[in-house]
Design a protein with these regions (language model features):
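Catalytic-core regions of core metabolic enzymes
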Residues: 1-263, 267, 271-278, 285-287, ...
Length: 295
């Protein structure tokens, strides 16, 4: 990681981790990366007992309890992804964007079904879905469009008219009550890729807030255009939501108050506590049996 922090061509750092062998070293490198403006994203095995056993058998290291890993990543500004696909697609969300103030997301779309699949997953993961602010509604009225007040900014097919999608996205990105925006494009992404993604490319460029694009059904040409423009684009709603939540959960590194224990040492400590508790319970049970016999 240290080498990548110093590499001028590296913009973000992706980690596939079976275990963390040296917590101090990784923490220091991740903090250097944060100071250099290079986000560190991680996918780590070990959420389940089976995953921890696989990591142990393959690497010979202790994978560590999931909560300890989460706390370690959070303290050192390492964004943890739950899906490998999300890890590979998420970098543009983080590059050039500081940690957000909250977890407030607007979902703007021309296809209700595709947007609902992302919004549902975001809600399950803890995001707050923000309806269209009045500034967005006013801008859309100028284009002859009145939208509902639900959790989706649903432009319907009217969003394919010139200027409509761009007006909505521009005002959503400018709204103080929104931390990130998901753009969902429907079938126009397949048949008119340049027109479908043009307003996203135009309005997302230079924004201080990230934009996550999901196109349903999949449209490879549109995805390629977004990729070329440096905009995060996703092939599934699950990966889109996973990546965006990793961004929303990220915070600046916490102050170092004491020695950061490697995860395998944390795991050893927890195991020792469990053994001592087990011995205490056995001793208490034996004492109870003796007391019963005496009476």
């Amino acid at each position: 990681v240290d080498l990548l922090v110093d590499d001028p061509d590296t913009k973000s750092i992706l980690l596939f981790l079976e275990a963390v062998r040296d917590g101090d070293k990784l923490a220091a490198a991740a903090r250097r990366a944060y100071d250099a403006g290079k986000p560190v994203l991680a996918y780590k095995l070990g959420r389940s007992e089976a995953g921890r056993e696989l990591a142990l058998s393959h690497s010979g290291a202790i994978a560590g309890p999931a909560k300890a890993a989460d706390a370690f990543f959070q303290a050192n500004a390492i964004a943890r992804l739950e899906m490998l696909e999300g890890l590979l697609e998420a970098s543009p969300l983080f590059i050039g964007h500081p940690p957000p103030k909250g977890k407030r997301v607007a979902v703007v779309t021309t296809t209700g079904g595709g947007a609902a699949s992302v919004a549902d997953r975001l809600g399950m993961l803890g995001a707050t879905l923000v309806p269209a602010p009045e500034s967005v509604r006013t801008a859309l009225r100028e284009h002859g469009l009145e939208i509902g007040r639900g959790p989706l900014v649903d432009l319907t097919m009217a969003g394919t008219r010139e200027g409509v999608y761009g007006a909505a996205l521009e005002n959503l990105l400018a709204a103080d009550e929104i931390d990130a925006v998901v753009t969902v494009v429907g079938s126009s992404g397949q048949f008119k890729p340049e027109l479908a993604v043009a307003p996203i490319v135009e309005k997302a460029a230079g924004s201080s807030k990230p934009v996550a694009a999901f196109i349903a059904p999949q449209a490879d040409k549109s995805l390629a255009l977004l990729q070329e423009a440096g905009i995060a684009n996703f092939r599934t709603p699950e990966a889109c939501a996973d990546a965006l939540m990793a961004f929303l959960n990220r915070r600046a590194p916490r102050p170092v108050l004491h020695h950061v224990e490697p995860l395998h040492e944390v795991d050893d400590a927890l195991r020792d506590v469990a053994h001592r508790a087990h011995r205490a319970l056995r001793a208490a049970a034996n004492g109870l049996q003796l007391d019963i016999r005496l009476h």
